[in-house]
């Protein structure tokens, strides 16, 4: 908690996602923000902090952002969101980032262990499932105080494409995407509805298959369009949804990468499933009844995650 009694949010990585996280956090009055990056990026984080603070009078918020390169400023954070790492570029998979981002995560996790061991930590860095596994191991965080942001974003993309296909309000689309944050993620079509009507009754199978494919390739589509980086608005909003539920004890049920201990037949790996997030962190892990086809798809997704995680050398 900040010295002024407000909640304190530590953002590790001052790039596109980090900057948007800082803006969203103060606009929602979630707490004061510390935007951290390495010394080479000192001007970047201090500039973004100043820019956002000068916007306060326009939007009418009283929370503040501090740009820093000193981990001591992160100490006492209630929640930490990690975005530090190399972003994807055209032609790269999330797994291609493993070696370089693992080195970054090792440093970040060690500093969290030293300076903010009681924070609820949300990882956004890719490859998501492997990075959150490394974070948990290195920082020694309790299993309920660490999670990976993936499912909120993947589900949001799926809902977006469904709403576009039907020309309906996205608010009426209920859907869930499980599994790893990669090409084998599992949109649960059978459990998806629009205004209570099953999705399968509204969209033909071939069109649904195309939506599923586009959802799985959603990150790559944006990488191809941006050319020099990856998505940042969506990831930032998704991570803030998780942080907000923790900070305000909203107990929202959101798809996120959590440590499984037998659920869905998986043990000892972080995997995307519906979880309840409240003041206690990941308070519950919910299981969804799956048919044989869905189980097979989820197992395929898990094997992809397992292969990447098992290659992590700590």
Curated annotation (Swiss-Prot):
Keywords: NAD, Oxidoreductase, Tricarboxylic acid cycle
CDD domains in alphabetical order: LDH-like_MDH
Residues where NAD(+) binds: 13-18, 37, 101, 124-126
Enzyme nomenclature, EC number: 1.1.1.37
Active site: 181 (proton acceptor)
Keyword Nucleotide-binding applies: no
GO biological processes: lactate metabolic process; tricarboxylic acid cycle
Name of the top EC class for this enzyme: oxidoreductase
Catalytic activity: (S)-malate + NAD(+) = oxaloacetate + NADH + H(+)
A Pfam family matched in the record: Ldh_1_N
Superkingdom classification of source: Bacteria
GO MF term set: L-lactate dehydrogenase activity; L-malate dehydrogenase (NAD+) activity
InterPro entries (UniProt xref): L-lactate/malate_DH, Lactate/malate_DH_C, Lactate/malate_DH_N, Lactate_DH/Glyco_Ohase_4_C, Malate_DH_type3, NAD(P)-bd_dom_sf
Residues where substrate binds: 88, 94, 126, 157
Family: Belongs to the LDH/MDH superfamily. MDH type 3 family.
Function according to Swiss-Prot or TrEMBL: Catalyzes the reversible oxidation of malate to oxaloacetate.
Record's protein name: Malate dehydrogenase
Native organism: Myxococcus xanthus
